[in-house]
């Protein structure tokens, strides 16, 4: 599956090729900051299948939390495009896909301990208070 996407202003473009390893939603507070309050819808892809085709992403890694990840975003408009955890995968933000319908639906929800009353977890998918190991 070849997917293309980019940021809001168009300065950053990417392509990712392969099958998603996971399609999920995250309700953690860190993701709520990034999304403006909503759960974060994402796909985990093999890290070597993601590449930028236009522009250079700015990176940010928090140093004051356990298990930090590197977040990549457009230096012009600030759109959060993807996250790089230490384990060598690319966590692609669904809203940045040219065709978000290609995502389908999440197969699980994580960090529901931080879920807000206005967040929706689809019926029938596994939900975890933290990240499953």
Q: What is each stretch, according to the model?
A:
Residues 1-6, 11-133:
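A short Gly-Trp-Pro
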């Amino acid at each position: 599956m070849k997917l293309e996407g980019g940021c809001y202003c168009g300065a950053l473009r990417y392509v990712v090729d392969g099958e998603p390893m996971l399609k999920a939603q995250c309700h953690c507070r860190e993701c709520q900051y990034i999304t403006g309050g909503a759960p974060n819808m994402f796909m985990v892809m093999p890290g070597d299948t993601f590449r930028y085709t236009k522009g250079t992403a700015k990176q940010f890694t928090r140093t004051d939390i356990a298990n930090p990840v590197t977040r990549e975003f457009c230096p012009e408009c600030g759109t959060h495009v993807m996250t790089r955890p230490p384990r060598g995968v690319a966590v692609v933000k669904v809203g940045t896909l040219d065709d978000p319908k290609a995502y389908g639906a999440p197969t699980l929800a994580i960090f529901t301990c931080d879920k807000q009353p206005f967040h929706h977890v689809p019926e029938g998918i596994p939900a975890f208070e933290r990240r499953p190991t």
